[in-house]
Amino acid sequence: MQAKLTKKEFIEWLKTSEGKQYNADGWYGFQCFDYANAGWKALFGLLLKGVGAKDIPFANNFDGLATVYQNTPDFLAQPGDMVVFGSNYGAGYGHVAWVIEATLDYIIVYEQNWLGGGWTDGVQQPGSGWEKVTRRQHAYDFPMWFIRPNFKSETAPRSVQSPTQASKKETAKPQPKAVELKIIKDVVKGYDLPKRGSNPNFIVIHNDAGSKGATAEAYRNGLVNAPLSRLEAGIAHSYVSGNTVWQALDESQVGWHTANQIGNKYGYGIEVCQSMGADNATFLKNEQATFQECARLLKKWGLPANRNTIRLHNEFTSTSCPHRSSVLHTGFDPVTRGLLPEDKRLQLKDYFIKQIRAYMDGKIPVATVSNDSSASSNTVKPVASAWKRNKYGTYYMEESARFTNGNQPITVRKVGPFLSCPVGYQFQPGGYCDYTEVMLQDGHVWVGYTWEGQRYYLPIRTWNGSAPPNQILGDLWGEIS
């Protein structure tokens, strides 16, 4: 059911209500609930249920009428929202008001009986008092709920049979576009590697074992003038991160990237950068740019994408590389479990080939991950090399994602990820936070986030105390997205 008023019309109704008094039920004077009912009646012709204001979100069926939001640290109210304060207001009955303005720091409302002057004559029916609808600013609080009405559309929908309807035309859906790669050819100068005498026969895809800061540009800065002694430790043809490709060697040159004569002489090595330090989303983007560059090169050389032209480092020597790609796309971690089995190797190669073929055909593929991996969040199964440990014994890693609480309140801590630290507040069911850090400490997995300048630490599941990557975790107390 859509409201009888548009949002703009209801805002005007709220503005005209300032200075007036409302007693919608005819009892106990001009209560805050009466003013909420007056607005609800203007919108839907209905009255709300509940003994006190705090009952409104739970005693009413808002299906089709409104959406109920529970306050979270980064929730932003909107004009026209009904805001419900919990039982710590109104002598246990709560409080309710209508939002007219809002920022992330405060709300400005129209409200009645905030000062308790809505019923002062002692007469139960109808009752009277001096307090009128007033405009006032409040801080967000916990718990607090916001009820957002389904306002009438600003422009009423027209019947499909109306003669004023324009003829429908087929509109082409916008097609996704490939990232425009920034290819920087700046061949290493410290040593002139030998020529192979022909185009490469295949591409070897690597994971670089680099930190978050190990971007293509960082490799360029560190290797372009490196001496022979450094290049002998390994040099691939290209390094890829974001939309940047640093071409370190000419296509005609032999590379030193597989520790194998055939791989070095006939293969073109490409490093997917930041494989040890980047979050999954960043690494998957680096992969996609790598696939796009592979497609460009294969087309240039007149080669198809198949199992002969797309190779893995671990085909030429005993190595876990490409380790991060293996975890994401096969669910098998060669760093902790040993060499990648042949069936997993073929699974990974075929994924690479499918992605590259799509780029060769002018399509934009979608990155997919194995159900056995934890690509949506390292919180579930962290990559051991991404963890660090501080002087307090806390294991921690960078990660950016959203945690949404399940059906039980969680005590949030300040100062640090310890159960003995000061209590921040109660993180309510359905609330969410956008965190930037994951920690293992004091028998729990914690996420860290900042709200209004304060750093908070929220436990989201249990931890058995074992150091990563051998930790055993309990069930997640909500969802990660």
UniProtKB/Swiss-Prot annotation:
Any one Pfam family match given in the protein's UniProt record, by short name: CHAP
Residue sites binding Ca(2+) per the record: 34
Chain sites annotated for binding Zn(2+): 206, 313, 321
Gene that encodes the chain: LysH5
Domain Peptidase C51 span(s) in chain numbering: 7-148
Thermal dependence: Optimum temperature is 37 degrees Celsius.
Cofactor(s) this protein requires: Zn(2+)
Cited function: Endolysin that degrades host peptidoglycans and participates in the sequential events which lead to the programmed host cell lysis releasing the mature viral particles. Exhibits lytic activity against Staphylococcus aureus isolated from human and bovine samples, as well as Staphylococcus epidermidis isolated from human samples, although with lower lytic activity. No lytic activity detected against several lactic acid bacteria and strains belonging to Bacillus, Streptococcus, Clostridium, Listeria, and Enterococcus.
UniProt keywords, alphabetically: Antimicrobial, Bacteriolytic enzyme, Calcium, Cell wall biogenesis/degradation, Cytolysis, Host cell lysis by virus, Hydrolase, Metal-binding, Multifunctional enzyme, Protease, Viral release from host cell, Zinc
Lineage, highest ranks first: Viruses, Duplodnaviria, Heunggongvirae, Uroviricota, Caudoviricetes
Domain of life per record: Viruses
Protein name per its UniProtKB record: Endolysin LysH5
Ranges of residues in domain N-acetylmuramoyl-L-alanine amidase: 198-323
Regulation: Decreased lytic activity with increasing temperature.
Family designation: Belongs to the N-acetylmuramoyl-L-alanine amidase 2 family.
GO biological process, one term: proteolysis
UniProt source species: Staphylococcus phage phiH5 (Bacteriophage phiH5)
Annotated Polar residues bias: 155-166
Ranges for region Disordered: 155-177
EC number(s) stated in the UniProt entry for this protein: 3.4.22.-, 3.5.1.28
SMART domains the record matches: Ami_2, SH3b
Domain notes: Contains a cysteine-histidine dependent amido-hydrolase/peptidase domain (peptidase C51/CHAP domain) at the N-terminus, a central amidase domain and a SH3b cell wall-binding domain at the C-terminus. The CHAP domain is present at the N-terminus and is associated with the endopeptidase activity. The SH3b domain increases the CHAP domain activity.
Cofactor note: Zn(2+) is required for amidase activity.
Catalyzed chemical reaction(s): Hydrolyzes the link between N-acetylmuramoyl residues and L-amino acid residues in certain cell-wall glycopeptides
